[in-house]
A protein has these predicted regions:
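Polar-ligand-bearing catalytic/cofactor-coordination segments
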Residues: 1-82, 101-171
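Hydrophobic alpha-helical transmembrane segments
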Residues: 79-93
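Hydrophobic alpha-helical transmembrane segments of polytopic membrane proteins
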Residues: 92-104
């Protein structure tokens, strides 16, 4: 596996030893170029902004819920004297049910960034072949599903499937 992380002076690219051991040099260069693409295309700050927007939307939703007559009483709380506490506790408890339905939006952005980083790597390397062969090896080693159902993929995959990535690289 490989990933890019960090902001400012704390930026890092991690390449796992298992990745280094299973790929050829040109494939490693493509993977490294892919991770550099995440940096150059500012994917980490964009995802932080996206997460911040989701948090704001969640807090706005909390405000709307907290103002609904009978909401806190429906869960056994008194509406008098507790202020914002019960709605906040309920929001924390119920938020995973809400954010689950937003997962496809986050997955969409993540997959979009993966396509962009793949394209960046192919452009920098001058060929899409090293990236394609690296992806094939990684998918084989990880026993990845080549054709996940789109609905399942939307909720559970933050990276496109091998077939989707290869197809995008061929364009």
């Amino acid at each position: 596996n490989a990933f890019f992380t960090g902001l400012g002076k704390g930026r890092k690219i991690a390449l796992f030893d298992t990745l280094i051991n299973q790929l050829e040099e040109e494939e490693l260069e493509a993977v490294l170029a892919h991770e550099i693409g995440h940096y150059k295309l500012k994917h980490v700050p964009k995802m932080i902004i996206w997460s911040f927007c989701l948090t704001l939307a969640g807090l706005y939703l909390l405000d709307l819920i907290a103002k609904q007559a009978g909401f806190v009483e429906a869960f056994g709380f008194s509406s008098e004297g507790y202020g914002f506490g019960p709605p906040f506790i309920l929001f924390i408890l119920l938020s995973s049910n809400i954010t689950f339905w937003l997962t496809p939006l986050s997955s969409y952005w993540s997959r979009k960034f993966e396509y962009q980083a793949d394209k960046f790597a192919a452009t920098v390397i001058g060929s899409n072949l090293p990236m394609v062969t690296a992806l094939r090896k990684l998918n084989e080693k990880n026993l990845s599903n080549l054709t996940p159902h789109p609905l399942y993929s939307g909720f559970h995959y933050d990276h496109p499937s091998l077939i989707e990535r290869e197809s995008a690289l061929q364009k």
